[in-house]
Each structure stands twice: as structure tokens, then as C-alpha cells.
Amino acid sequence: MSLSAFYVTGTDTGIGKTFVSCILLHMLRGRGQRAVGMKPVASGCTYSDTGWRNEDALALQAASDPTPAYDLINPYALPAAVAPEIAAIEARVTVALEPLSASFTQLRAQADVVVVEGVGGWATPLNATIDQATLVRALEIPVVLVVGLRLGCMNHARLSTAAIMADGLRCIGWIANTIDPHMARIEENLALLRQRLPIPYWGHLPHIPPGINPATLATRLHPQGD
């Protein structure tokens, strides 16, 4: 895989972007690459003696090698577990592109690949003037879409893909992640998604119970190099 960085987004919130990002980090490391994660903006943080910390950002840090400083991985750690724009207003924090770009540049200098995880679904804004598309353009990286397999996934996947492309960005692949283990016709839905989405398919993850080490699933994903 020749990419030096990419942005992981999803069809919605709670569809496994962090877990998929961690799997991708382990996959890259297994290929001998130095791979680090980044969560530019995270809402829903717990205060500790080292400051505000976000569970997803900590998972990315644990899956990274080398292990970057937390503040590089997650420049904006917002306390409230709500939409980032609201969380930033409540925390009286102004999310700006410059600190995000600076952290990304430092991470890129430390690793062969940087896996940047977004917030919520693709259209979730970071603030009143910065969308995720704005950030991705500033970082000059392509996008990977995580599709949560549950009822309605066809609509969400097609809309998300169309939105990314309408924003003038490259969507270089998609990953199916089973959210609802009781979803009817999973294989049929997966087959239709593979027919309808005009981007490369990187693999399918079954429903994963809590506590599974993402490293054990690294061989299930097969990025089609860029």
C-alpha cells in the first residue's frame, strides 16, 4: 500500500470507524510500515491527571507504532459527548485548521502512514465554517468509507459516497462492518453494495463482540493500493 495517509469516515456515527482504523493500523504494521493514528477532533472525553482524554483517540494511540504523544493524535479533546460543533461551543474552544494541519505534519514525519479518523458521518461539521471536507482538502489526503451493515445501509452508503465525490475528493475504498448481527440478508446486501458503490471494496468485517483485539482481524482487510 503506497499511500502515506488517508481519512476514515463513515456512513453514520457508531458504525465502527475507530475499530476499523485500529485494524488498518495493525494491518499496515504487519506489512512492516510505521503507522500512526490521528483523531483530529473528539467529543466525549474524560478528565485525568494528564488532561482530557478520549477513548477512541486512546485506542488509536495504542494501535500506533511508533506511539505519538496524545496531543498530536487528538489536538481537540472536547468534554461533552455531543456533536463536535456543540461540544466546542460549550467548551469555549474554537476548532481551527492550523493546529490540525500542524499535528498531522508532525505525525507524518514520524511514520510511513497516518490513519486519520473523522467524526460521525461524512456531513458532520467540525464547526460553523469547517466541514470534514475542508479538513481533508487541507491535509490533501484521500478518503476511506466505513459502511455500517444494518437496515438502511444501501441508502447511507450511496449518499455518503456521492457526497464525498461531490466535494471533489477521492474516495479510494470502502469497508463493510457488520453492526447488526441479526440483519436480514447480509450477504445479499453486501453483494448489492459491491455492485452499486463505484469505489474499490476493501473487505467485510463480521459482527465483533466487545474485547476483541483488532490485531487479530488485520488479515480480513485488503486495501487496493493507490
UniProtKB/Swiss-Prot annotation:
One of its GO terms (cellular component) is cytosol. Keywords: ATP-binding, Biotin biosynthesis, Cytoplasm, Ligase, Magnesium, Metal-binding, Nucleotide-binding. GO terms for molecular function: ATP binding; dethiobiotin synthase activity; magnesium ion binding. It catalyses: (7R,8S)-7,8-diammoniononanoate + CO2 + ATP = (4R,5S)-dethiobiotin + ADP + phosphate + 3 H(+). Pathway: Cofactor biosynthesis; biotin biosynthesis; biotin from 7,8-diaminononanoate: step 1/2. GO terms for biological process: biotin biosynthetic process. Its main location: cytoplasm. The keyword ATP-binding applies. It is found in: Cytoplasm. Catalyzes a mechanistically unusual reaction, the ATP-dependent insertion of CO2 between the N7 and N8 nitrogen atoms of 7,8-diaminopelargonic acid (DAPA, also called 7,8-diammoniononanoate) to form a ureido ring. HAMAP family: BioD. This is ATP-dependent dethiobiotin synthetase BioD. The lineage of its organism: Bacteria, Pseudomonadati, Pseudomonadota, Gammaproteobacteria, Lysobacterales. The gene is bioD.
